[in-house]
Amino acid sequence: MNDKLYAYPMTADNGYFLYYDKSVLSEDDVKSMDTLLAKADASGKKFMMSLNDAWYIYSFYAGAGLKATLADDGVNTVCNWNEAPGADVTQAILDLSTQSAFKSGADADIVSGIKGGSCCAAISGPRIAGTAEESWGESYAATKLPTCTLNGVLVQMASGSGYKLVCVNPHTSNV
């Protein structure tokens, strides 16, 4: 910031993915949210993600080209979700929430659904990967987020990303 080093990235492992059970869903099924939901519904299973968490619903807004980011001043945030495509995104989220094959839930709910066999796909971060792999065994898979339909147009959902930083002491002689 302002040409000064305050920290550098140590990891970039705080994104999220689509985890799925290959015994229920094929690689092609999970490319589209519409197909994923139809196949999950036909199998009597659920697709899960948290809709009450801006971290995860960002994926819909980012797919529409909207942003929530740090302002140029490095202090304030900028969010343009209220622009024209934002209404389409909000409608797509509302439409998803009414699907019989969809269930909103936090990670603990998703883990419970995977372990209990009711969940065949979920959007979450790396912290549920072990549970999904253990529960689904050879049928475990993970991939990028699916496309979703916004006002009749397919858009690619996008993951947020987070970074762990190592801070730098500006007073040290080693900088």
List each model region and its residues:
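Periplasmic solute-binding protein
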Residues: 1-31, 51-75, 160-169
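Short, well-ordered surface patches within globular domains
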Residues: 29-39
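Short loop->beta-strand "edge-of-pocket" segments that line small-molecule binding or catalytic clefts
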Residues: 37-50, 68
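Short helices/loops that flank or line small-molecule/ion binding pockets
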Residues: 38-42, 95, 108-122, 131
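Glycine-centered hinge/linker elements that transmit conformational signals in sensory
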Residues: 75-106
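Paired acidic/hydrophobic, glycine-rich loop segments that form the ligand-binding mouth/hinge
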Residues: 120-125, 141-143
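A ligand-binding cleft/hinge motif common to bilobed small-molecule-binding domains
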Residues: 126-139
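Extracytoplasmic/periplasmic substrate-recognition and gating elements
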Residues: 136-175
